[in-house]
UniProtKB/Swiss-Prot annotation:
Residues 43-157 form the Expansin-like EG45 domain. Residues 1-22 form the signal peptide. The keyword Membrane applies. Expressed in roots. InterPro entries: Expan_Lol_pI, Expansin, Expansin/allergen_DPBB_dom, Expansin_CBD, Expansin_CBD_sf, RlpA-like_DPBB, RlpA-like_sf. Residues 167-246 form the Expansin-like CBD domain. Disulfide bonds join C46-C74, C77-C152, C82-C90. It is found in: Secreted, Cell wall; Membrane. This is Expansin-A8. May cause loosening and extension of plant cell walls by disrupting non-covalent bonding between cellulose microfibrils and matrix glucans. No enzymatic activity has been found. May be required for rapid internodal elongation in deepwater rice during submergence. The gene is EXPA8. Belongs to the expansin family. Expansin A subfamily. The keyword Transcription does not apply. Keywords: Cell wall, Cell wall biogenesis/degradation, Disulfide bond, Membrane, Secreted, Signal.
Length: 251
């Protein structure tokens, strides 16, 4: 009985520690770009292209080197709040959750506190203007913020846009829920076993398997370690340039 109580106590303690970790806020800074309609945020270093079509809309941000992680953070979600203790330009009581869709490159010609906002090791979010104006006043230009990584809430299944050529497949993965960021991918043709893919750039994953004419399945591992499988999501007659929506998702 004592052992059982001890196990319950340990489980409760672990749950409290996990909750505390999930609630941790980290200081950073934020600016904005892309115009009032966010048209200048389309495309970007994650490869999502039309952010409306990809399902991300205007709630997006470009991440500094310290956060972008060479593209491994593409698709991750962050809740950002302006730090009212450090600036008068916040909109008090507000926060917004954004998706990482782009890279904010360093500018080594300027110091980190005078224009080189995204220089390492600074944690910085260059937000879309509509997202920024949810939490801060336009004229401020830059504000101190606090952020935390949060689960991504997505509608529908993970989507796979198959590009490339007959000798390789370049697959753009979008609409990933849960962690949001893809750490590893595998591809399988209807006549093959599972084969590991490699990150080409951003959210684009490459295979040199020559799978023309075979139905395609994908296995996705998020950066929290969870794995889902999208079986036969692209039929045997799939074509380059098409996007295929699966029923698989990190719920």
């Amino acid at each position: 009985m004592a052992a059982a109580r001890m196990l319950v106590l340990l489980a409760s303690l672990c749950a409290l520690l996990l909750t505390a970790s999930a609630a941790k806020w980290t200081p950073a800074f934020a600016t904005f770009y892309g115009g009032s309609d966010a048209s200048g945020t389309m495309g970007g270093a994650c490869g999502y292209g039309d952010l409306y079509g990809a399902g991300y809309g205007t709630r997006t941000a470009a991440l500094s080197t310290a956060l972008f992680n060479g593209g491994a953070s593409c698709g991750a979600c962050f809740t950002i709040a302006c730090d009212t203790r450090k600036t008068q330009w916040c909109k008090p009581g507000t926060s917004i959750t954004v998706t990482a869709t782009n890279f904010c490159p360093p500018n080594y010609a300027l110091s980190g506190d005078a224009g080189g906002w995204c220089n390492p090791p600074r944690r910085h979010f260059d937000m879309s203007q509509p997202a920024w104006e949810t939490i801060a006043v336009y004229r401020a230009g830059i504000v101190p913020v606090n952020y935390r990584r949060v689960p991504c809430q997505r509608s529908g299944g993970i989507r796979f846009a198959v590009n490339g050529h007959s000798y390789f497949e370049l697959v753009l993965v979008t609409n990933v829920g849960g962690s949001g960021a893809v750490a590893q991918m595998w591809i399988k043709g209807s006549g093959t076993g599972w084969m590991a893919m490699s990150r080409n750039w951003g959210a684009n994953w490459q295979s040199n398997a020559r799978l023309d004419g075979q139905a395609l399945s994908f296995r996705v591992q998020a950066d929290d370690g969870r794995v889902v499988t999208a079986a036969d999501v692209a039929p045997a007659g799939w074509s380059f340039g098409a996007t295929y929506t699966s029923s698989a998702q990190f719920y």
